[in-house]
Amino acid sequence: MPVSKQVIATEAITRKVDLDNPKVLAKLKKNMGHMTYGEPAWPNDLLFMFPVVILGTIGVIVGLAVMDPAGVGEPADPFATPLEILPEWYLYPAFHILRIAPNKLLGIALMSAIPVGLLFVPFIENVNKFQNPLRRPVATTVFLIGTLVTLYLGIGATLPLDKWVTLGLF
């Protein structure tokens, strides 16, 4: 008797699909009922696998930080100023716009024009309901030009002012 209860309990958890049942076959033809088999996420994944992965990741990060602490860079020297101070890499394009603008107010206006211009892209492309980028030429063109200009300004920010136009290639 306990063996049959064990088998029933196991079948209730795993739920194997009966492919001889015409109702199940009809559901599968309609792409319905495909989640009626397999191991349930609750409680197996949520109570066991997720905490193990999260705690394991935290353990690896803490272990690496304790065993080999990374240096932050050169120690600070308040009496030596670097020749050129650059921001972090993700701020290079904005820094370069400010650097090449003849007037700082114009540089701030140019930086403010970028998000304002991006706000208008959905309204320009509103007539096109496709999700494929090849069928949305305006949004794709704005994305490609914006990416190229951002890369150009980001690379140019690392060069001296007399070489940034050609990116030091010529």
Swiss-Prot record:
Q: Which HAMAP family match?
A: Cytb6_f_subIV
What is the species of this protein?
Synechococcus sp. (strain JA-3-3Ab)
A Pfam family (short name) is: Cytochrom_B_C
| One of the protein's GO biological processes | photosynthetic electron transport chain
UniProt name for this protein? Cytochrome b6-f complex subunit 4
Assembly behavior: The 4 large subunits of the cytochrome b6-f complex are cytochrome b6, subunit IV (17 kDa polypeptide, PetD), cytochrome f and the Rieske protein, while the 4 small subunits are PetG, PetL, PetM and PetN. The complex functions as a dimer.
Q: What does this protein do?
A: Component of the cytochrome b6-f complex, which mediates electron transfer between photosystem II (PSII) and photosystem I (PSI), cyclic electron flow around PSI, and state transitions.
Query: Which membrane topology term applies here?
Result: Multi-pass membrane protein
**Cellular component per GO, a single term:** plasma membrane-derived thylakoid membrane
Q: Where in the cell is it found?
A: Cellular thylakoid membrane
Instruction: Give the record's keywords alphabetically.
Output: Electron transport, Membrane, Photosynthesis, Thylakoid, Transmembrane, Transmembrane helix, Transport
As for family, the record states: Belongs to the cytochrome b family. PetD subfamily.
